[in-house]
Amino acid sequence: MSTDKTNQSWGGRFSEPVDAFVARFTASVDFDKRLYRHDIMGSIAHATMLAQVGVLSDAERDTIIDGLKTIQGEIEAGNFDWRVDLEDVHMNIEARLTDRIGITGKKLHTGRSRNDQVATDIRLWLRDEIDLILAEITRLQQGLLEQAEREAETIMPGFTHLQTAQPVTFGHHLLAWFEMLSRDYERLVDCRKRANRMPLGSAALAGTTYPIDRELTCKLLGFEAVAGNSLDGVSDRDFAIEFCAAASVAMMHLSRFSEELVLWTSAQFQFIDLPDRFCTGSSIMPQKKNPDVPELVRGKTGRVFGALTGLLTLMKGQPLAYNKDNQEDKEPLFDAADTLRDSLRAFADMIPAIKPKHAIMREAALRGFSTATDLADYLVRRGLPFRDCHEIVGHAVKYGVDTGKDLAEMSLDELRQFSDQIEQDVFAVLTLEGSVNARNHIGGTAPAQVRAAVVRGKALLASR
């Protein structure tokens, strides 16, 4: 007869219940219950394996699996009573299973510890989350390709130091973000490979004395391989850290993109218009249309950076193997995944709806001597050393600043006062179209190269 006075699965060696505050303080069920589906998935695979090796009978296996599926239905219908006194998602489900099917439910945990159970749950969950995030990246990239194809010839100023630098096409600019997101996609795919290793069977830390078949469980759960060391399997969270690192880079890219969208929608730039459905107003200023979506994505980036820092700090001082510290791995991981997925979704919805203001973009590109490098290159082709050409054009720009004229607005005589190598054909070089069309190589801003990059991008997405 049980003498457990603690209402806990581990209460046999204790003589008094856990303090009520400590029970609440140490419980994780309020946040780890979102792992219920993966916990049940792992338990079904574990029960199947136990029956295969003779630890459970086929009838016991079937009873357990039916009970677990019923419990999943209760949870998804909102009819499950989550209890803090049962600590976590694992014990809540196991206790409910025992309530439903009796003593057979107590056999499910044979050859298993919550240490390898939770490590398995998190990996299963993260694997699914990465798949959802990858789908959102692809959707955003599709939107970028559509916009880039439409705007292959739309000219805008390119910037360095947020100062006008050279003319570029809007399509080319958008494709820069496509390239960054492609690397984000690759990082997450690579991260998924290392997350897709199965700790189940590691038990508490040293493995189990039961004749388990880890390869069978691995196959049932769709893992690529089993964890090769039981201590490592239960104790490390480097896969979660790696995910948060990849998520941080992706959010950094979205944050930079957000900053551009905020600038471009401002009265000072007016390069684009965001549809009203992605903006909000002011409670006091009737005229305001605020770009809240990109602003909020920019702000949320700090949460993901914080998750990465938090997980690194969490793990840095832990000896092998499992420690209670690891309970703190879930909330930052969950938040990082939620934030990245939601931010990508917002961008994937918003980017195809952006409306560029072509005339304003072009007018801005005509300011700031954006074709100065083209004039220097023109002189190089006339046989002058580049550094001399740089100096010559610098004097021409200074003259333009003093007279209020762009290079293309100067007469031939005005330009020739800086070099007698300048001829009438220079004006074809100094046009915006001449500037962008001249950069007609892979990775360049010429419209032909933008269209070629779009074709490559579509092929990349089709190959996923």
Swiss-Prot record:
Q: Where, subcellularly, is it found?
A: Cytoplasm
Gene Ontology CC entries for this record: cytosol
Gene Ontology BP annotations: arginine biosynthetic process via ornithine; L-arginine biosynthetic process
Q: Which CDD domains match?
A: Argininosuccinate_lyase
PROSITE patterns associated with the record: FUMARATE_LYASES
Going by the UniProt record, its keywords in alphabetical order are: Amino-acid biosynthesis, Arginine biosynthesis, Cytoplasm, Lyase
Disulphide bonds in the chain: none
Q: EC?
A: 4.3.2.1
Q: Name the chemical reaction catalysed here.
A: 2-(N(omega)-L-arginino)succinate = fumarate + L-arginine
Membrane-spanning residues: none
Is Repeat given among the entry's keywords?
Answer: no
SUPFAM superfamilies, per the entry: L-aspartase-like
Keyword Amino-acid biosynthesis attached: yes
Molecular function GO terms recorded: argininosuccinate lyase activity
Pathway involvement? Amino-acid biosynthesis; L-arginine biosynthesis; L-arginine from L-ornithine and carbamoyl phosphate: step 3/3
The record's similarity note reads: Belongs to the lyase 1 family. Argininosuccinate lyase subfamily.
This protein is called: Argininosuccinate lyase
Q: Native species of this protein?
A: Pseudomonas putida (strain GB-1)
Q: Which gene encodes it?
A: argH
